[in-house]
From Swiss-Prot:
Domain of life: Bacteria
Sections of the chain in a coiled coil: none
Gene Ontology molecular-function annotations: 5S rRNA binding; structural constituent of ribosome
Protein name: Large ribosomal subunit protein bL25
Entries under NCBIfam families matching the protein: PRK05943.1 (NF004612)
Keywords, sorted A to Z: Ribonucleoprotein, Ribosomal protein, RNA-binding, rRNA-binding
GO cellular component, one term: cytosolic large ribosomal subunit
GO terms under biological process: translation
Family label: Belongs to the bacterial ribosomal protein bL25 family.
Function field: This is one of the proteins that binds to the 5S RNA in the ribosome where it forms part of the central protuberance.
Keyword check for rRNA-binding: yes
Quaternary structure annotation from Swiss-Prot or TrEMBL: Part of the 50S ribosomal subunit; part of the 5S rRNA/L5/L18/L25 subcomplex. Contacts the 5S rRNA. Binds to the 5S rRNA independently of L5 and L18.
């Protein structure tokens, strides 16, 4: 399973809200020897794969052309809408 991601430059609550209104959501990739990286993911491409068991195993994120093997660590969902607010990924 592979997802395209972009490094996030604007941080904070306002920037996160703008992303969510644009049908995207913020995420972070951490772990290993590298520094944590804030990224942006497309909501529809992720939410359509979340019901599959393979999503919760090792997946590939393509962050600005570089492939990174990660595993979902934490998923923050909207209380009553079928939306993802934020995700944490841990490098494998």
């Amino acid at each position: 399973m592979k997802f395209e991601a972009v490094v996030r430059t604007d941080l904070g609550k306002g920037a996160s809200r703008r992303l969510r209104h644009a049908n995207q959501f913020p995420a972070i990739v951490y772990g290993g020897e590298e520094v944590p990286v804030a990224i942006v993911l497309d909501h529809d491409s992720v939410i359509n794969q979340m019901d599959k068991p393979a999503f919760y195993e090792v997946i590939t994120l393509v962050i600005d052309g570089k492939e990174v093997q990660v595993k979902p660590q934490d998923i923050q969902r909207h209380p009553y809408k079928p939306k993802v607010n934020h995700m944490d990924f841990k490098r494998v």
